[in-house]
Amino acid sequence: MEVKLEEHFNKTFVTENNTAASQNTASPAWEDYRGTENNTSAARNTAFPVWEDYRGSVDDLQYFLIGLYTFVSLLGFMGNLLILMAVMKKRNQKTTVNFLIGNLAFSDILVVLFCSPFTLTSVLLDQWMFGKAMCHIMPFLQCVSVLVSTLILISIAIVRYHMIKHPISNNLTANHGYFLIATVWTLGFAICSPLPVFHSLVELKETFGSALLSSKYLCVESWPSDSYRIAFTISLLLVQYILPLVCLTVSHTSVCRSISCGLSHKENRLEENEMINLTLHPSKKSRDQAKPPSTQKWSYSFIRKHRRRYSKKTACVLPAPAGPSQEKHLTVPENPGSVRSQLSPSSKVIPGVPICFEVKPEESSDAQEMRVKRSLTRIKKRSRSVFYRLTILILVFAVSWMPLHVFHVVTDFNDNLISNRHFKLVYCICHLLGMMSCCLNPILYGFLNNGIKADLRALIHCLHMS
């Protein structure tokens, strides 16, 4: 991600070189050879102040940049490492979303390791000091890590959309997660494959002809033409920013809409239940007037009070004293000398039948209505929380990565729009904003995830105790 710095200076030097050479083309014919040397010297003398202006643009802020990059890198590394450890701790309870979140943490760790130190070193030292092989490998790894992290965000959004839209037929397993991760990494390697080919080292001594720049190299992109470079930049803009932003917005909007529709259905069902209760259950006075006579009721004898809730209890069901018309149906015939004839008159009833049932206290319609309303209030609160969380996810991605992509597009189409003195400072600001997404992803996808939050707390507690 730091190659834009050297590429900008390389193209700036070529522009200054052509300008200086064109200003000295009017030399006489007999001084052609000498004029050629003067043109080269003039070009170098003109471009060297450009290099000095470019090189000293962040000298006053180098300690501040070192501290800021160190803080962002440590925060992103530790946060993603905790998420990765928590997900690996629950590897026996694999879900597709948790599996993707673990891979997101791993890719963000790669972004922190590959992008921060190499970018900061190139900004402060104004040279590439990691060798020719790393010049071909490191830009490729930087691009792959950022692209994979972005594609995993798309995968998480798609999986959540599928789980909300098809909750009953949700059959996503760990194998689907493996397939998604394999697809993401394959796309990342394929899209970033041109970078190892079109990179090369440029020696500053040969460029400026100054002994002060001996043994200093720049790692720059060496595309066959500007059209190739612009096409690659636009393709990265589409894949790394526009496509993920559209997918996140559409998916999360659909999720919020589904939740709000489900909530409205529950409210409508509550209103229907209230109308049914008013129809089937009249007022208290009318219920008292419609009570049956006491001679037609059964008396229930329980072991404990009726107000408490019992799981399984045995009770004896005894008929109430019957009238004269019903006594012949309730009395058991007596035979002389039988056990029945020896019982007392009060015991000459049908024997109690042991039954098992669940006793629940009778709940009034007002209490039931309050309970349902409290449930709806909790659901509304959770719905607002989900809406705010998904909105923050979209805003964090859009705000953190937009400046860097705009910077790349602007510098590819117009190098002179940003001055040499402010070029590195503007680039560092855009790059740090992009790195902030690696620090916020653990919070948004891990610490605010109910499935991982408890494991994170236990893990942090164990680390604190040790």
Swiss-Prot record:
Glycans are attached at N10, N17, N38, N39. GO terms for molecular function: neuropeptide Y receptor activity; pancreatic polypeptide receptor activity; peptide YY receptor activity. A lipid is attached at C462 (S-palmitoyl cysteine). It is found in: Cell membrane. InterPro entries: GPCR_Rhodpsn, GPCR_Rhodpsn_7TM, NPY5_rcpt, NPY_rcpt. Residues 85-98, 160-177, 251-389, 449-466 are cytoplasmic. Disulfide bonds join C135-C219. One of its GO terms (biological process) is positive regulation of acute inflammatory response. The keyword Lipoprotein applies. Pfam families: 7tm_1. The keyword Endoplasmic reticulum does not apply. Keywords: Cell membrane, Disulfide bond, G-protein coupled receptor, Glycoprotein, Lipoprotein, Membrane, Palmitate, Receptor, Transducer, Transmembrane, Transmembrane helix. Residues 323-346 are annotated as: Disordered. The chain crosses the membrane at residues 64-84, 99-119, 139-159, 178-198, 230-250, 390-410, 428-448. One of its GO terms (cellular component) is plasma membrane. Residues 1-63, 120-138, 199-229, 411-427 are extracellular. It is a multi-pass membrane protein. Belongs to the G-protein coupled receptor 1 family. Receptor for neuropeptide Y and peptide YY. The activity of this receptor is mediated by G proteins that inhibit adenylate cyclase activity. Seems to be associated with food intake. Could be involved in feeding disorders. This is Neuropeptide Y receptor type 5. It comes from Mus musculus.
